[in-house]
Amino acid sequence: MPKVPVYNMEGAQVGEIELKDEIFGAPVNKAVLYEVSLMYLANQRRGTHDTKTRGEVSGGGRKPWRQKGTGRARHGSIRSPLWRKGGIVFGPHPRDYSYSVPKKVRRAALKSALSDKVNENNLIVVDSLTFAAPKTKEMIRVLNNLKVNGKTLIVTAGYDEIVEKSARNIPGVSVMTAPSLNALSLLNHDKLIMTRDAVLKVEEVF
């Protein structure tokens, strides 16, 4: 079982925690990470793109000139795809891009991402994150104490409004609950900060 140090909010080590091998010590499967990340990104797409066909472009109801006798090519509408401002052939139309992969695969990707954070020493466990009131300045102080910079994901056991509000104005810092943790969020951040309770919650849920 991998062991990682546990820090307090002042950045001092106050102990160690043993992590479950099957979650934090799993082999890193890049193929699964790619497949699941692609799914999450596809599911975020709105799919509202649209183009007008020749039947949807305004105008073009009248034949531009008579069929024969002018010496010009024959045309039936000024909204033909051949014309400037004409309709679009086989253009994009609104569609749903979302799809799903099996839960077992999603969990394998999450375990791979968590294990990668441990392998790269990018997982920081804190005994707790408690603030008297929402203060961005206090959260910045804690991050500085932990020597954390760059894109950082903070994971709490459950929803914590004070932690959420304290971190939301810091660029590159996000807050999630342990049950909603996913592989894409982990891959999108360089550092992972988890409370001790969040680690236990992840081991319980996943």
Curated annotation (Swiss-Prot):
GO CC annotation: ribonucleoprotein complex; ribosome
Q: Which GO terms describe its biological process?
A: translation
HAMAP family per the UniProt record, alphabetical: Ribosomal_uL4_B (MF_01328_B)
Q: Where is the composition biased (Basic residues)?
A: 63-77
Provide a Gene Ontology MF annotation, just one.
structural constituent of ribosome
Family according to the record: Belongs to the universal ribosomal protein uL4 family.
Identify the stretch(es) annotated as Disordered: 47-77
Instruction: Please state what the protein is called.
Output: Large ribosomal subunit protein uL4
Q: State the UniProt keywords alphabetically.
A: Ribonucleoprotein, Ribosomal protein, RNA-binding, rRNA-binding
What InterPro entries does this protein's entry cite?
Answer: Ribosomal_uL4, Ribosomal_uL4-like, Ribosomal_uL4_dom_sf
| Keyword DNA-binding attached | no
Role summary:
One of the primary rRNA binding proteins, this protein initially binds near the 5'-end of the 23S rRNA. It is important during the early stages of 50S assembly. It makes multiple contacts with different domains of the 23S rRNA in the assembled 50S subunit and ribosome. Forms part of the polypeptide exit tunnel.
The protein's matches in Gene3D superfamilies, at most eight in alphabetical order, are given as: 3.40.1370.10
Q: How does it assemble?
A: Part of the 50S ribosomal subunit.
